[in-house]
Structure formats: structure tokens, C-alpha cells
Amino acid sequence: MAIIKRVVRSKAGQAPVKKGAKIKKASYDSSRKKEVGVSDLTLLSKISDESINDNLKKRFEHGIIYTYIGYVLISVNPFRDLGIYTDDTMKSYQGKNRLEAPPHVFAIAENMYYNLKSYNENQCVIISGESGAGKTEAAKRIMQYIAATSSTHSESISKIKDMVLATNPLLESFGCAKTLRNNNSSRHGKYLEIKFDAHFQPCAGHITNYLLEKQRVVGQIKNERNFHIFYQFTKGAPEEYRQLFGVQQPEQYIYTSASQCTAVENMDDVEEFNETLNAMRTIGLTKSEQDQIFRALAAILWIGNISFVENEAGNAEIRDKSVTTFVAYLLEVQEELLIKALIERIIETTHGAKRGSTYHSPLNIIQATAVRDALAKAIYNNLFEWIVERVNNSLQAFPGADKSIGILDIYGFEIFEHNSFEQICINYVNEKLQQIFIQLTLKSEQDTYKKEQIHWTPIEYFDNKIVCDLIEAKRPPGIFAAMNDAIATAHADSDAADQAFAQRLNLFTTNPHFELRQNKFVVKHYAGDVTYDIFGITDKNKDQLQKDLVELLSTTSNSFVREIFPDQPQTDSRRRPPTSGDKIIKSANELVETLSKAQPSYIRTIKPNDTKSSTIYDDQRVLHQIKYLGLKENVRIRRAGFAHRQVFEKFVERFYLLSPQCSYAGDYVWDGETLDAVKLILQDASIPTTEYEIGVTQIFIKHPETLFALENMRDKYWYNMAARIQRAWRRYLQKRIDAAIRIQNAIRGKSGVSTFRNDELRNAGDKVYGGKKERRNMSLLGLRGFYGDYLSCNESKTRGSYIKRQANITERVLFSSHGNSLHAMYGGASQRLRKTFILTPTSLWIVGHTKARNAMKYITDYRIDLGKIRSISVTNLQDDWMAVNLMDSPKPDPLINLPFKTELITRLTQLNPRIHVKVSSTIEYLRGPKKLFVVKSQYSDSAPKYHDLYRNGTILVRHGNPPDSTAENRPAFNNEDMYGNLMEAKHKTMKKKVGTKRTPQALPTSSLAASAAQAAYHPKGIRSPTSTEQKSPSKSKPITKTRKPPVSSPVRNTSKTISNSKVYSAPKASVTKRTQDTVSVSKTSVKDDVTQEKNAIIQTEEKQNYSLPENIPQSSQTDSYQAAYDFPGSGNPSELPLQKGDIIYVSKSDPSGWSLASTLDNSKEGWVPTSYIVKYNGNVTDPSAQHQDMNTMKIQEDNTTSINEPETHTNQGPSNTDLGANLASVLAARANKLRSESEEDISREEDDDDDW
């Protein structure tokens, strides 16, 4: 048993000392789920767009949305809440590296924060993907993790963290909107920097805004919405705002109702409006500032309700002047100036350096509507920029905030039916991000291989620099430069500017990534070809508010409006003002420069479908994204040299269990260099050297299958350790069961109850063949009993009970045993298969054995109703074959080979007397319907000595005992003889281990047998009488003609001979006087005892010496004896209680260990334990010195015949009863020997690997 082994081993040497303080102890992750697909695309066996898509789809269908490509995270939008952003989930990623937890956005955040603290380098995460793929959600989760993970020790730090988190709902309200593809689409780009102090606590922040889609303010396509804030404000505005600003429901405003979508499923605008107000308060916006913000929003909504009619001259006029009156009230300007600005345009002419004339040109309805929308867009754009700047002021950096983590959340790549200036700007920025992604990824890989001195082959990839130059270049001019030239040529006329731009596009026709079509042009982006409309594109690029509107807003008495429009028109400046294209190019290049200064992380988001369904995975849609995101190229780059790499410490921490030299009982014990530990692990795991390379600080593994093999071996380590503990525990339980059975047998023997209760069944077995079949030697032994349930199926926690459960057997088992069944194969061949045969009161079960996943499974092959058995066919020779002939069964008749066939047949005939037993030289049975097969039998000297041989339909067997042979009589020996010495040896072992002096104690009132049973079930709960010093049990020497008295020996006799007579041990007590004959006990180990007992048993079996000792004169009835111990008795009236020192007469000694005694006055008589009394010679005698005489007396009473005086027997030779008794003793000894050897073999097998 494993527990004993560890105790023994600890005597020889202590366990290795734990080493490697940096290496964490390995632990079994019970929460680990079964891997779906691969968690890292670099581990795919085949690299293709289709295999990547299949892996992502498989994980998406199982609710797993995150996958790695090395350190790049792939995120598939689930369109539902998966419950994976809880506080417990966050805690599970804290302090763990990428391989220690499943892919997750929290793992990216943890890696950035760890690198910030460890290497003191700025970090950034680039989140890319198309609209609706989940970029904004990923950014929010990163901010959530960093705020929760970074420690907080002051109120100011906590306030900054709250303010950083509050920017999310605020900027989402003003910068996000519902589109056809996404309910919360970012219509602007932002780069949020969270800055940290020297203690790596967030102490400041800064937001950079990129290109707000202001066109959405004045118009949206059907089923899309304006920015969220308009619907939140119109639905959730308090009564105060409704009175001051005239706020109505969104259906009352053209800007919020024209697209016929004012509500979004699963979005509560009123609740989100309250969150927006809370975010404003958290950031520090005052009540006055909030009022001014909502006043401007109300002005925008009412501006949208200004409508025009055509007058008689064909010019525009205000349809309802009450609307313009209210707008003038909100903007705090004069109504007349507002109306003029909307329906007239001021035109100035110049003559050289002289001032020219000024004209007021009336506008038509289309032109007036454009001016109205331009005013609304300008107010909202400037309001949004003011909010961003106000947030940055609140997040003002404290001194020492020089390190940061940047989070880029920018609009994704867009392809619509009609694409204009906004789309080319958005797609240009994504091209720049794709360019920096490729450059930084390749650069990072190259730097890693160079630093680690690893050689690799560069991989080819598409460099989209040519597309970026096509859009942003100045010499030769790109698309934006051509657009600026067209505007400068025809500044006042938008149509003329569009035509001039179309002409300049002819310069790009030679570019392979450009195509010019009628009134349209195509740019072949990395994400796909996009067709842009030329009409109106130049006007959107101007980014200038008309002079009329600027002058109007400059007259306002509202300080907030003047604040958001600070710039005054420069009428005398001849320098061309920057266009929107110029601004976006400048912002994109600044962004690239900022990202290049930080250590980047990447999140690539994917949108699974266009219907926002949580169950649909559109393969073609995702395949397109996989291609334009370049995931296949990214995988190839990552795997160009090696599929997996890890620093030495983390590799050892993960796999040190695979090396016995590095681990002991789950602890890391290697005290050498970590590099040497890496080499040992790879060597002990049998990983070929061609599968890896070792760098300076990292181990590089070439193929994913190698990593899979390492992970599989690590997983099996825990399984093997659990299985080993289970085996040890089962052995321990089985030992207790065996001990209980031995004690029960001893109790039954002492009480006169026969251990063998199946004598009548055994005798019936002699008659079952009718004297026609030869018998085996083992079948005729007197010790042979029909025990029935040999597999202990009716017991609990046994293999038999496990088989019974597997076969779904619910009845009580009458017979169970292992055997074989002949299975007919195609072509006439046959195969012997191992089976288990179980007999119940109604059925015969044949259970097959099947091995699956290194575990044995038991499946029912046959369930035969006893009433369906017609006959049993056996041969007339001593073989073990029998055929069960069935009645009208579609299945073939079973042909069985079973050592206990006679017992099974006997039980079958008793349960169903109509079963006929056919004994013949052949066995006939049906192999199939109407397919009779005959098995012959014949003698053969080539057959095994104790078995038979089946060959080509013939049973070969040796000659057996005559058919009329009957079994020997049951041996008349007591079970206590067999097991008594074993229990005594156990007590001796315990006393040797303890080694402390104890005074003799009286036995408890319960009987000795009951005490022994208690000791078996509770080994530590019983204390037997012990002595201070013990003598080794003396050994009887081989019998000679002149008998020598037994002599005590200080050392156990190592002679290879042993007498057949039993030496009964008795409890020993401490003595007050030592004689010269007594010898001090030898401190012999338990192992020596077992070895000598085994040698003695082996010698006995070799010599087959069944001799009995010489007769010894019987003791007279008047012999006097003295009580050596107190014997209070168990309360049985047949016992005679004694106190130590009492003198008694002994008239009879029984082999069971009891003596019939009486007091000196013959007033009381009863049974006393023989081992508790010694021969009385008139002095106080040492009990130990008398025990040999008592044993001699018992031997004399046990054996009524001496081999030295055979003439005294009536029959020549030993009787059957005496021979059976001695043979039974030898068989019992052999059984104990085999059991001991089996246990030692099991222990020997686990000595090498018992490291748990």
C-alpha cells in the first residue's frame, strides 16, 4: 500500500528539498474546460482561410468568442451576454500569463499592465475591425480591467479611475449611433491614454478625437438613427428642460424621425440618459455647463425643423417663422440675422489690393436647406470637440505621469452602397492601421529572433503602403491632394469643383489599385474594393462654415456659443485654410507616430453576420473579413519559424512535472539552472531535438503537435496520480475486508460453526455426472468447497460488485467466476475470449470484457433464462469445457471453459431440475440456427499438466482420476489454527515498532475474538497485553528418532526447514524475575520476519514433508497450573474467571486454545485460555519459560499418531482426515505466501514512480 511505502522509504532517506522559489507549484485546474478547436490559430495543422474560419465557427457555436494568433487576440462578436466579464473572471486573469488562462480580452489587458510595470514601457492596444464587430465593447472591457486591477491608495487616484470609466457612457452617447450593422456603432475615432504615476496607479488621462461623422446629425438612411444623445435627451429630459428648451418627443423632430427609427431593441434611452448625466457629474461638468450643452442640443433639433417655401421669384423663404424665433431664442441671436443667414449669401468681390463690392445673393430651397444643415453640423461638431477637451481638462495629468496605456477605438472599415468623403477618410485610417500592424508585427518577430539568435526565413506578405500613398501622397499628388486642387480652382461652385476633381483622377489610372468609372472611382483597399461617388465629395472636404453663419454666431450673447466658436474669419489672409482631408492625414500620421512609441497589442474583431443574430454564423461574411484582416498571413508570419515560444521560467513552471529529476510529489526540486531544467524536461518527454530550438531566454517549438504532446502528457500526470491513489486506497480497503473475513472464520471455528456450509452441495457435485466423467485432483481435495460467489459480487467495494453494476444485475448472486468462452469466427476459426460468469436465481449471465481508453468495461453478452436451458453437455474426460444447450434461441449455444464447472452445473440442476447433464466423448452444441457443431475429446501427453488444450475442434487433456472417484472428507482442523499466528505476528510487529515499556493489562470484558475483530476494523483502537521484553518464537527442528526439547533462540531460526506441527503463540507479560533460560528479545525487523516465514513455507512445499512430531506424554488430570494473567471472562457461565497467581487443576486441553480447569476445592469448573496459565512447580514461575511446554502439550493433543510409531495405527499410513488436515495447512500457507508475494510485487512496481 502506498501509505506504508512512504513510511518505509522515509527511513532510508528524506524527500528532496523543495527548490526553485521562482517556479510556482503545479496544480490541477478543476475548472478547466475541454478545448474546443484550438485556442491559438498558430496551432492549426493546416493554415488556410477555410481552416481558420472552421476553427472560429466551432468556437463561436460553443460560446467561445476569443482566439489567439500568438499575442494577437481575435474576437468574434457574440451579439449576446455570455457572462464572461464578471469580477470573478477578472480575478482569474490577474497575475497570469497568456498560456495560464483561456484567451480573453482581460488577458490582453493583464499583459499590457504587467509589461508596463515590469519593463516601464508605454503600452497600447490597437482594436480594429469593421463596424459592428465589437471594437467599442473590447475597449470598455480593457478600461474596466485596468481600473479594477490597479491598486488604489488615495481618494484622488480613485476619482481619476472613476472619471476614466465615466468617459465611456459620455462619449458613447455623443459619438455612437445605430446603423444597419451595429446598434452601437462608433461614428468617430478616439485614442484614450490612461497615464500612471511612479507606483503604476492611474493618475490622469487624455483623449484624442478623430473625424466625427457630423453628416449623421442632419440625415440618416432608413432604419438608422442619429447620435444616441438626441433620443436620450428627447425621451428622458426632465420637465425643467422641456419648459426652457421646448423639448418634445423624437417623433416631433425631422433630424430624429426622418429615418423612421426612434427606438432600438434592448436599449433603454431613458436609463442611458441617466447614466450620461451621472457620467457628466463624475467628470466634473457643472450644472451650468450641462444646461448649456442641452440648450445647444435643443437648438440643433429645432434648426432641423426649419423648412422653406419658394416665393414668386423662385427663392427660398421661411415656412414657419415661429420656429426661427425659437431657434434665435436658444442661440441668443437676433431673429432677422438668423433668417438672412439662412436664405441669403454674402458675396464680396475684390480688385487687386482694393476692396470690391458686396452683394446679397438670395438662395433657392436646396441651397437654403444646405445652409441650415451646415449650421446644425457645425454646432454639433464644435460641441463634441468642446466635450472632449473638457474631459481632458478634468483628466489633467499630475506631475510624474510619464507612462501610459493607450486604447485605440476607431471606426471600422466601411463599404456601403453609396460611399462618399466620410467613407474614404474612415477607410484611409484603417489602411494606416493595417500598415502599422504589419510593420510592427514583422519588426517584433524579427527583433525576437535576432535577440534570441534564432534563424528564420522571411515570409512574403502584402504591403499596403502603395494604397496609403495613393490616398495621402503630395508628390505625386494623391486623391486628397487632387481634391484640394479642385477646391482651390472652383471654390465657390461645388459642381465645378467635383468636375475638376474627376478630371484630375485620370492621373491615377496607371495605379493597379485604382479604377476610374463614370462619376465614380474605385480604390482597392486591403479589405476589399470600394466604389466612391464623386458628386458632393469636394464640398464635404472644404470643412469651412460660410462667412454668413460665422458672423451670425459671433453676434450671440451666449458665452457658451462664443466659446465653442472661437475662431474669427480671417478676411485678409491669402493662405488656404486646411481641408478635412488635410486634417485627417495629419491626425492619422500623428496617431501612427504615437503608436510606434509604445509596445503594441492587437485585437482583431470579426462580425459573424449582418443581422445581429446570436446564433447565425455567416461563413462567406466571416471568410471575407478573415482575408482582408490578413489573419492567414499573420499566422504564417507567427509560424514562419516556430509555432510556440516561451521564456524558460514559464516553460519549466508549466512542464516540470514531466521530468522526475525536476519534480517530487508535485514540488519543483531542481536546484540547477533553469536552462538545464528545460533540457531535462525535453529529454525526459522524448521530444526530438529537431522539434525545438533553445534561444538565449526562450524555448522555441516548431510544430503545434509537439506542444499538444507536452500538454497531453501533463494532463495524464494528474490522471495517473489520481489512479495511483485510488489503487492504494482500494488495496487498503481490500486488506480490511480480508482481515474481517479471517476473523469471522476464526470466530465461527471457535464457536463450533463450520466454515464450509456447502458440504451438501459439494456432495451433490460428486453425483452430477453419474460416475461417467473423469475427475481432477483439485476437485477431490477435502479442502475444496462450493463457495459460490468467488468474485464477492454481493459485497460492497469489490471488483465483483463493480462488474455486477456494469452488467446491470440486480438479483443476488449465487455463483460468480472468471473463465473463457469460445467465439466462432469467420472461416471456421475460433477464439477463446475472457468472460465472467454470474449465476442468479433466475438467470445465467455471461459478461464480456472490453478495454476502452485504458479502462476495462464489462458488457453483458448473454442473459440466459434458466428455464430456457435444455441441457448441459460435457466430455467424459477431466477437461473444463461445457456447452449450455438452449431451447429455441436465435443465439448460438455458449461453449464455456470454467475451472469451477462442476459447482456451476450442480447449482444449475438444483435451480432447474429439468436440465439434463449429457456426458459423452463429444460435446454437441449449436453455433448458429441449425448449425450443429461437434467438439471431440482425446488423451494427449502434450496437453498441459493441470489444464486442457483446445485445437481445431478437439479437446486435448491428460488422464484423470477414475469417474467413480469421490471427494475426500472435510479436514477436521480449526480455522483459528490457520489465522491465529498471523494475528499474533501482527501484535508482535506493532510492539516492535512502538518499543516502549507497558505493564500487563487485563483483557476487556469482550471475548478475544471480538477484540480481534475490533482490531481489524479499527487497527489503532485496540491494545493487546504486551511485555517489556519479548522472546522470538522458537522453531521446532526437524523430527529425528531422538526428540530434542525446543530451545528459545535470540534470533529467528533461518533454517530452510519447518515442521508441519502448529506452534500456538500466547500473549506474553512482563516478569519480575529472569531465569538463565530466558533470552532478550531480538530486534528483528518485520521485513526479516516475513522473509524467513516465506523461506520456511517454500522449503515446506519443496520437501512436501507432512510428518508429525513424536508423541509426548499426556498431562495428568491432576496437574497444577498457575494463572500468569488476570482473566475476568466475558460473562459466559462456561468460563472460569481467574486472577493472576491463582492455582488451578487442568483436566483437559482443547486444540482451540482453551483448557478445562477447576479450583483446588473443585467448587468451580470452567474454560480458561491455555495461553494464560503456566505449569505450577511450587514457585512463582516465569510464564515465558513455560510456553514451550504448553505448545508441546497442544501439539501432542492435536496429533494422535506419530510417524516414528506407525505400528500403533490400525491402518498403515496416515488417515485421510490427518492427511487432509496437513494438506489444508500447507494450502493455507501457500495462499498466504502468494498473497504476500503479490502485495510485494505491487509495492515493487510503485517504488520507482511513487512521487505523489
Curated annotation (Swiss-Prot):
ATP binds at residues 129-136. Residues 719-739, 740-767 form the IQ domain. Residues 36-715 form the Myosin motor domain. It is found in: Cytoplasm, Cytoskeleton, Actin patch. PROSITE patterns: MYOSIN_MOTOR, SH3, TH1. Phosphorylation of the TEDS site (Ser-357) is required for the polarization of the actin cytoskeleton. Phosphorylation probably activates the myosin-I ATPase activity. Residues 1050-1063, 1106-1121, 1203-1219 have a biased composition (Polar residues). Residues 988-1086, 1106-1136, 1203-1252 are annotated as: Disordered. Gene3D superfamilies: 1.10.10.820, 1.20.5.4820, 1.20.58.530, Kinesin motor domain, Myosin VI head, motor domain, U50 subdomain, SH3 Domains. Type-I myosin implicated in the organization of the actin cytoskeleton. Required for proper actin cytoskeleton polarization. At the cell cortex, assembles in patch-like structures together with proteins from the actin-polymerizing machinery and promotes actin assembly. Functions as actin nucleation-promoting factor (NPF) for the Arp2/3 complex. This is Myosin-3. The lineage of its organism: Eukaryota, Fungi, Dikarya, Ascomycota, Saccharomycotina.
